[in-house]
Amino acid sequence: AMFKVNDGFAATNGQHNFRILMLPDESNFMHQATEVMSNDRLGTTVIDREEDIYYNVRMRLKSSQRGRNNSRRVGFNLRFGADQPYRGVHQSVAIDRSDANSAHNTELMFDIMIANSGGLISRYYDFIKVLAPQDRHTKSAILQMARYGDVFLDAQFENGSDGNMYEYELIYSPNSADGAGNKLPSPDGVNGVRITDLGDNKEKYRWFFLKKNNRAGDDFSDIIAY
């Protein structure tokens, strides 16, 4: 377990503080250019709202291949232990810091309006101040809780998570490396496909239509039929 005392960064304007405590060597390793695209998770302790402490939380970076190595845009994805889900509900949450353009702020305002209008399908987000392992990443951010996952699906639809959900994605191929031959996240090549019939082989769909739930079933029949 880790703790921090009187660091002077806590929000005093009503924002919820979300502290992520991590060993400096591991944080530095995670942010190396050759490591930022790894989805391997490292251990952290999370302190929520200066009261609730979560141990053995596993964290990776969150953003695009260009954003993860950008201190203004990089975010975090945290997975909580099965014995201590976040706020008693969520096995994972994400923190979005990517305020690089005004479009991001517009999207956030739509999320807030939809969530508070009642009777509409919406994600559940919250404003926070993230106190990150590295001070340069400490700032206001968006805490993404019930994203388009099982908690969201079951809350909005009867037996919602029984179905299959896919996320359209592009494939990014690094085009450069450091002196040791380790790939760097950019520059890169980008490949995609149109939403069209790719045949009956699910491997043609796997990396363009990422399976977002019920992964153990490895079922791509719905997207193939679509």
Predicted features along the sequence, with ranges:
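Regulatory N- and C-terminal appendages and interdomain linkers associated
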Residues: 1-56
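Extracellular/periplasmic catalytic domains that process cell-envelope and extracellular macromolecules
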Residues: 10-14, 37-39, 68-72, 86-89, ...
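Internal "kinase-insert"/substrate-recognition segments embedded within catalytic cores
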Residues: 79-87, 97, 119-123, 136-226
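Soluble non-cytosolic domains of exported or imported proteins
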Residues: 36, 72, 100-108, 213-221
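A conserved helix-loop-beta module that forms one wall/lid of the active-site cleft
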Residues: 98-133
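Conserved oxyanion/phosphate-binding beta-strand-loop segments in alpha/beta enzyme cores
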Residues: 40-99, 212
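Structural recognition of the beta-strand scaffold that forms the well-ordered cores
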Residues: 55-58, 75-79, 92-97, 104, ...
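Short, solvent-exposed loop/turn and secondary-structure capping segments
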Residues: 31-34, 57-58, 68, 89-91, ...
